[in-house]
C-alpha cells in the first residue's frame, strides 16, 4: 500500500441482491427447453451465486439494447480470511457472463443457440480489499464489437458501493 490520492467512479443506483432473481431460479423456469439428459448438469449448484437484474441474464432475450449488464454475485459459503483466495475467486467469477454484454445490441443470446463464444484474454485489477463471500455488484459494458469480436469490461463494487476491482 502506498499513500496517494484516491477516487472511484460511483456505483449505479440499481436494485440490491435481495430484489434480483437468482440464476438458478431463471434456469428452473426454462428447464423444459433443456434436453432431459442435460437437466441435472444444467441445474447443478455452482460455487458462485449470481442474481441478475430482470432481463439481464445471459439466458434472457435481450430487452435492453444497450451494451450494459449488472449482476450481483458472491461465493457460496464462508471463505477463509485469505485475500489471495478472494481475488482468485473473483477473477474466476468475473469471466462468467461477461461475454454476453456485447451481444445485447445485436439481440444475440446463449438461450437462442446462435452464439459460439470464448474469452480470448482476461485481466483483473484489484483496487481495494473485499470479501468474495459477500455480495458484489459486477457492472459490465461493451464499448465496441467488430470483426466478430466483442470487447467487454467490468467494475466490481461491494454492496456499500466501494469499487474493489476492474476487469
Spans of model-derived segments:
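Terminal targeting signals and extreme-terminal segments of soluble enzymes
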Residues: 1-167
Amino acid at each position: 500500500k502506498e499513500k496517494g490520492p484516491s477516487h472511484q467512479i460511483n456505483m449505479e443506483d440499481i436494485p440490491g441482491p435481495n430484489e434480483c432473481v437468482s440464476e438458478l431460479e431463471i434456469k428452473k423456469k426454462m428447464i423444459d427447453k433443456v434436453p432431459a439428459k442435460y437437466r441435472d448438469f444444467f441445474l447443478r449448484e455452482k460455487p458462485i451465486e449470481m442474481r441478475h437484474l430482470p432481463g439481464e441474464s445471459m439466458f434472457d432475450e435481450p430487452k435492453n439494447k444497450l451494451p450494459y449488464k449488472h449482476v450481483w454475485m458472491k461465493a457460496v459459503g464462508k471463505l477463509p480470511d485469505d485475500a489471495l483466495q478472494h481475488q482468485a475467486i473473483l477473477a474466476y467469477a468475473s469471466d462468467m457472463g461477461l461475454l454476453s454484454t456485447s451481444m445485447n445490441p445485436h439481440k444475440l443470446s446463449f438461450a437462442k443457440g446462435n452464439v459460439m463464444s470464448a474469452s480470448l484474454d482476461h485481466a483483473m485489477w484489484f483496487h481495494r480489499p473485499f470479501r468474495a463471500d459477500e455480495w458484489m455488484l459486477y457492472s459490465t459494458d461493451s464499448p465496441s464489437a467488430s470483426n466478430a469480436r466483442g470487447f467487454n469490461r467490468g467494475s466490481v463494487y461491494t454492496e456499500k458501493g466501494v469499487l474493489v476491482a476492474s476487469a
